[in-house]
Swiss-Prot record:
Source species: Homo sapiens
Domain of life: Eukaryota
Quaternary structure, from the entry: Heteropentamer. Part of the GPI-anchor transamidase complex, consisting of PIGK, PIGT, PIGS, PIGU and GAA1. Interacts with PIGK.
Segments in the Cytoplasmic topological domain: 2-19, 394-425, 484-495, 537-540, 620-621
Residues the entry annotates as binding Mg(2+): 355
GO biological process: attachment of GPI anchor to protein; GPI anchor biosynthetic process; GPI anchored protein biosynthesis; protein retention in ER lumen
Gene3D superfamilies in UniProt: Zn peptidases
Name recorded for this polypeptide: GPI-anchor transamidase component GPAA1
Amino acid sequence: MGLLSDPVRRRALARLVLRLNAPLCVLSYVAGIAWFLALVFPPLTQRTYMSENAMGSTMVEEQFAGGDRARAFARDFAAHRKKSGALPVAWLERTMRSVGLEVYTQSFSRKLPFPDETHERYMVSGTNVYGILRAPRAASTESLVLTVPCGSDSTNSQAVGLLLALAAHFRGQIYWAKDIVFLVTEHDLLGTEAWLEAYHDVNVTGMQSSPLQGRAGAIQAAVALELSSDVVTSLDVAVEGLNGQLPNLDLLNLFQTFCQKGGLLCTLQGKLQPEDWTSLDGPLQGLQTLLLMVLRQASGRPHGSHGLFLRYRVEALTLRGINSFRQYKYDLVAVGKALEGMFRKLNHLLERLHQSFFLYLLPGLSRFVSIGLYMPAVGFLLLVLGLKALELWMQLHEAGMGLEEPGGAPGPSVPLPPSQGVGLASLVAPLLISQAMGLALYVLPVLGQHVATQHFPVAEAEAVVLTLLAIYAAGLALPHNTHRVVSTQAPDRGWMALKLVALIYLALQLGCIALTNFSLGFLLATTMVPTAALAKPHGPRTLYAALLVLTSPAATLLGSLFLWRELQEAPLSLAEGWQLFLAALAQGVLEHHTYGALLFPLLSLGLYPCWLLFWNVLFWK
């Protein structure tokens, strides 16, 4: 405390911080990026292991042999669906009852805030069908769910056939201690959300649905199944849920264990498992998988029906059967045995999955990075904001032109702004106007779509996207608006105080985001931190303005789309990338209003106003 109370030592510390601030910021930023890249190497990545004792052994004998029956069910389902043009509810009810299930239906409807051009729907109505296999060895206090989503663009008939065949097989076993729910949903995620809201007796998205007539126990785990054909070359697993939530790592380990036992090839992000982590090729392949997971998790989208279960504290996965040109193929029996083994092990659980990690990154199915090892990466990036804020704070509070050494000898002068007060209006005006622009970006696109369609020849979805872009671009005029009302008595100290507030605001936002969705926080910190530190009204303003635009939240989204397709080995042209960007904007707004995805409000109400503050600093007069 003596160092801070002694004015001479305090000034010496301020002088040292001001002198070393720039190299420390560069070093901290490079350390954050390097730490993230090093996560794929064995010293930081660990082998996965089963933490739950009840699932530690795979010594169960899978007896499923209903491949022919599953294919017959699939053919009948596809024929009835083609004939009716919708989900064959009556056929599903009749078939589920024939295999011994308690069968119930649920109707639902939802009017979207604007038409979904990706799936070509606006007024959505459908019916979910589910059957319950009651546990013969216990009361109906706990349950497991096997669900198959059926969308308008893909029937998923093979998965429905396998679900019905598994239901018939499970019905003949007597060892079940948990109820098993076999759920077929219409309209993909909309049907899943309607069923989950009704099951838990909540309404968080404005979905209109009929109450459930039959319930099982509290859902412990769920598996969503998607199959494109009756033979697969691999099973791809999706773990990313709504707002970046992840299932317990033990559920993923269970899937991998039974795939290995049955000889099934399993993939993550469509990538094969690296075989050798000691050479450079293994970590490089793991880096591709890790980046794909980071991009998918940062989007906040539920990448499968399982993503909506996670909101209700239900551990869930989505398994997708891939039929590629690989030589070795597996039939429905192999997939059914893997699912049977997973459900039999989950049947042994005495409590919810909780032993293993909920926050992790996956460079491969057999490797993971825990939260304690990846958080320093974003911590180093946020340290840059802290160092710059400390520098500005010292410049604002340390007055005088000559600083003395501890021995009394005068030291070289540190140029500091004159000791003047900062007018409150110089901070309040840009803060209020920036937040008002963010509020307009959040509210007006959906509210004003009908007005736009009346005056311009555009559809509702196009009107929403164009309004988003117009308001976003209008924020560039913010400095011209705020400079009319701010105080100009201390212009230098005014922009420094505004930047200090903006740095603290950005650091708090990125820190909170990184705690709940590390991938989103890290991506935004990687792009926004350097330009936030560099922004000032002096120097090459044109260069700083170009960098600030290229690292804005919208530009980060656009760059992420190009990187995503590049990692998938399907690069985009500029025109294709722009079209995908416009579609992503519409989907982001739609998923927020439909499922409660938080990416759109985070960007519009938080990060966009903060970015406007740095834009204001850059053009301060």
